[in-house]
């Protein structure tokens, strides 16, 4: 089950370009050819809500363009309604395990996860909180090429964090990567009070350092689900 469901991280069968191009052009108000100097029509990753393309801006910057599937907000609402019905039925027969709070949390998060403006703003806030760390990469957002359903950001050229063999082949110290990842999330949660709340392998990359001998960095993407913790909660 884990192996099969893990495909949802970034290996969902992609939607055809003919279906996704109109989303970009409608959201950004121009043709793809005018908006970007280059745009690869083949998606480099596809997940449950959107798929990602590689492109290049007119100034030569390599970017990733995240495009939401048409009609996904309505589908999410339909799925949540179905889940609500199921957990309400479950609650009539099961008194020990109550799944209703889980669906409550999903319903609170859903509007933010399908709003890429929220995602971009969250990425910028976390980047500001971690600006003193040189072991993490968070993509810059290009707001003139972004909207609620399209998000253009720096392309992070990294190795999926679960691909340990590729990391070792690149000469990366994998135990040190693990230490960095733990320290990074401890910093976000316990010190800075805002953290990336969806750290599955499709959202975490290991980026070899350009400086020889320096440790690899952690690349974080997809800030659609972030959480903020009050000071009092963190202190407790």
Regions found by a protein language model. Name each.
Residues 1-188, 193, 206-231, 235-236:
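Broad phosphate/nucleotide-binding scaffolds in NTP-utilizing and phosphate-metabolizing enzymes
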Residues 193, 198-200:
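Conserved catalytic-loop position in the HRD/HxD motif
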């Amino acid at each position: 089950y884990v192996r099969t469901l893990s495909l949802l991280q970034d290996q969902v069968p992609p939607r055809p370009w003919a279906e996704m191009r109109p989303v970009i052009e409608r959201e950004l108000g121009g043709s793809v050819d005018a908006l970007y100097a280059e745009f690869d029509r083949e998606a480099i990753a596809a997940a449950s809500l959107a798929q990602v393309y590689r492109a290049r801006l007119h100034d030569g910057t390599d970017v990733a363009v995240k495009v939401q599937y048409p009609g996904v907000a309505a589908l999410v609402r339909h799925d949540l309604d179905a889940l609500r019905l199921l957990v309400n039925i479950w609650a009539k027969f099961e008194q020990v395990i109550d799944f209703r709070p889980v669906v409550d949390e999903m319903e609170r998060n859903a509007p933010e996860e399908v709003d890429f403006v929220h995602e971009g703003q969250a990425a910028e806030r976390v980047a500001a909180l971690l600006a003193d760390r040189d072991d993490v990469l968070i993509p810059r957002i290009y707001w003139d090429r972004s909207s609620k359903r399209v998000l253009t950001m720096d392309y992070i050229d990294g190795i999926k964090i679960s691909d340990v063999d590729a990391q070792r082949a690149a000469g990366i110290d994998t135990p040190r990567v693990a230490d960095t990842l733990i320290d990074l999330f401890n910093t976000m949660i316990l010190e800075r009070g805002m953290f990336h709340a969806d750290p599955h392998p499709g959202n975490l990359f290991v980026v070899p350092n350009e400086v020889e001998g320096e440790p690899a960095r952690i690349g974080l993407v997809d800030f659609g689900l972030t959480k903020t913790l009050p000071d009092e909660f963190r202190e407790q």
